[in-house]
A protein has these predicted regions:
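Interdomain motor-coupling "hinge/lid" segment immediately C-terminal to the ATP-binding subdomain
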Residues: 156-253
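Accessory nucleic acid-recognition modules appended to NTPase machines
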Residues: 215-217, 222-402
């Protein structure tokens, strides 16, 4: 598989590697399963002296035995050599060999990658302390880079990065690997995918590399999704259930919370009413899911997140949003052998519910396009704040929203955008509403800011803005991939 993206992360690791020629370096790399940690580390370690070890959910003795084999193999020692007695001896040996590598190849420092560190640390509660001693006394004079990786984000943040961790303050870099954006993900999609297929794929699978890599180049969008998600033996059919069981102690309750969110219950009170738990208990589950990067709490643009009571929760990972919206309700049909009928009812033709779902995801894609354009210089705009606004329109006397609002405090600019994923669009009406709603996000601070108006559409527009007093920037979905 071709390596795609992650250039910023590679740059961080390469800088660490250069620094390790003069002093010890330590990186913490984490992110949930399937996100591409192994691919990133493998790409970074190409043509370098690297020991690559992955712990497993097994006893401490078994992990130590596996580590011993990997280390002995790297240093070309006989396979009959006995395992290390403990982790202290193992790390002491690596430190000694690192110094030997330094003498023989001073321009090629050693890299030690310890993947799935949480598994080993849970099997040996003193492992973090053992690494701390090794870093402070054995590795500190070694020209090497230590990379600790993990998929359990909660563990990595509390037990490795947290203030109470023995390893606190010893890292020289940390990377929380995020899903690809639309444009990075599209590079992994089938060659026969049209721009609309790419939008649909990203809306359904999101930016997790592993999910996208499962797509068959010879199959259509509908065929791929049916095979992966609506087939009882499909690779992604049970994916959310497996992640819940692996990461969480009470998967059934978390599953209920996600089901409630997928049906539109977006506050703790609504979720509480739906699943029968006290709202205070629901908040605990929401925070945990937020920590996993599966859900997020949104507040209207411009409000203080610490004091705002208008926050709404939603599933932010597109695949989980798709799975809980369309796959979970049809599990009964799928497990009775009616997977094709279940998939066809959703994927066949212009299914209204799916089109509405894509429209919701399209808003996030447009946000990503704006950020991407700002990053590559396509827009002279620095989004210091970015979000969505909703609330009361005092003139229209109704509740309304604005899909995207971004503020550039540095250059004193305010960007206001609407996203319309529709086959038939009244362009003049959309432009009129966009301009009218701009006043709803104005305040004493930004009232004199330059206003930038954008309208994102599914297809190119024919609207003639010559009579408009304000300039409108039109961006259609196809153009997003070529600009």
């Amino acid at each position: 598989m071709v390596f795609v993206g992650r250039q910023d992360e590679l740059q961080v690791l390469e800088k660490l590697y250069e620094n390790s020629k003069h002093s010890f370096q330590m990186a913490i790399v984490y992110g949930r399963r399937r996100i591409g940690k192994t691919s990133l580390i493998s790409q970074f370690c190409k043509n370098k002296h690297a020991i690559l070890f992955t712990a497993r959910e097994q006893t401490n003795i078994e992990n130590l035995r596996d580590f011993s084999r990997v280390v002995y193999d790297f240093f070309n020692l006989p396979s009959t050599t006995g395992s290390f007695n403990n982790w202290n001896d193992a790390l002491d040996f690596v430190a000694q060999q690192s110094n030997a590598v330094d003498q023989n190849a001073p321009k090629s420092p050693l890299i030690l990658v310890f993947d799935e560190f949480p598994y080993a640390a849970q099997a040996d509660k003193s492992l973090a302390s053992t690494f701390q001693v090794a870093i402070d006394h054995k590795f500190k004079n070694a020209n090497m880079t230590l990379i600790l990786c993990g998929s359990n984000e909660g563990f990595m943040e509390s037990e490795v990065l947290g203030k109470k961790s023995p390893l606190y303050g010893r890292r020289t870099a940390q990377i929380r690997l995020q899903p690809f954006n639309l444009f990075e993900a599209s590079e992994l999609m089938p060659n026969n995918a049209t721009w609309e297929d790419k939008i649909n794929y990203f809306a359904s699978l999101g930016g997790t590399p592993y999910y996208i890599e499962q797509l068959d180049n010879k199959s259509s969008f509908a065929e791929n999704l049916e095979q992966l998600c609506f087939n009882i033996s499909g690779i992604l059919y049970a994916e959310p259930d497996m992640l819940m069981r692996q990461e969480l102690r009470d998967p059934s309750t978390y599953n209920s919370v996600l089901n409630a969110l997928a049906t539109g219950c977006n506050t703790p009170t609504l979720i509480s009413d739906r699943i029968g738990l006290p709202a205070t208990s629901v908040n605990v589950y929401l925070k945990t899911l937020e920590g996993l990067g599966l859900i997020e709490r949104n507040i209207p643009f411009g409000m203080n997140p610490l004091h705002c009571k208008k926050g709404l929760w939603q599933i932010c990972d597109p695949f989980f949003a798709y799975w809980y919206r369309f796959v979970a309700p049809n599990k009964g049909l799928i497990e009775r052998g009616l997977s094709h009928a279940a998939a066809s009812s959703i994927l066949g033709g212009e299914h209204e519910a799916f089109s509405t779902f894509v429209g919701q995801q399209f808003e996030k894609m447009c946000e990503q396009w704006i950020v991407h354009q700002c990053k590559v210089g396509g827009m002279d705009f620095l989004p210091t704040k970015l979000g969505k606004w909703w609330g009361a329109d005092p003139i229209a006397r109704e509740q309304t929203d604005i899909d995207i609002v971004a503020e550039d405090d540095i250059n004193k600019q305010l960007l206001i955008a609407e996203c319309k994923w529709r086959n038939n669009l009244n362009e003049a009406e959309s432009v009129s509403k966009l301009l009218q709603r701009a006043t709803l996000v104005e305040n004493a601070k930004n009232s004199d800011y330059k206003k930038i108006f954008m309208l994102f559409t599914k297809y190119p527009t024919s609207y003639n803005p010559r009579h408009a007093k304000t300039s409108i920037n039109f961006v259609d979905a196809q153009t997003m991939f070529f600009n």
